[in-house]
Amino acid sequence: MLTYMESHPDVGLMMPRILHPNGKTQFLPKLMPSPKMLIQRRLRSVFRTQHETWMTKFEMRSMRDDQISEVGNISGCFSLFRTEALKRCGTYDERFFMYFEDTDLSRRIHQHYKTICFPFVSVYHLYGNAASKSWRMFSIFIYSLCQYFNKWGWFFDKERNQCNAKFLKQLDN
């Protein structure tokens, strides 16, 4: 990954393919989130019929394992940053204790650099999903969600729409 980043100065942030301990892919690179998508994701039992279609799109599940893809949201579980990108865009925003800190930083870096998933390297990640198991963690999730959308815009976010359209278009090629 480091060799790739060094030879591609337009890349500011990248992540490898992330696997569950059983070897199955975790769909952690995602589009830039919208409130609608997060509500649909959380209420999957209500939106049963459309849920898989929405999640396939949001989680970019059609990303190929043999192709580098630009993504809107790089998971904080494993990220490789270009130092210059951090100097230019800043580091983690202190408003986000947990949840959305990686989403916010991905978005800021993407304004100036490419943010990519590099599927030729894999790492294993034990996913805890704490926000669905604890009211305290869920309340932190909701607080961070509100902080994120207060910062970037709730429903009318032209930048998010343009970026997500670009990310999805590359998957069609």
Residue spans of the language-model regions?
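Catalytic donor-sugar/metal-binding loop of nucleotide-sugar-dependent glycosyltransferases
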Residues: S69-E70, C77-S79, T83-F97, T103-Y124
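Active-site-adjacent helix/loop segment of glycosyltransferases
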Residues: T103-R107, Q111-N173
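Residues that scaffold the ATP/ADP-binding catalytic core of kinase and kinase-like folds
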Residues: L28, L38-R42, R88-C89, R108, ...
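Short linear elements at protein peripheries
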Residues: L13, T56-L80, Q162-N173
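Conserved donor NDP-sugar-binding/catalytic core segment of glycosyltransferases
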Residues: M1-K30
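Short, flexible, basic/aromatic active-site loop/helix in glycosyltransferases
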Residues: P33-V71
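Short, hinge-like loop/turn segments at secondary-structure boundaries
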Residues: P29-P35, K133-R136
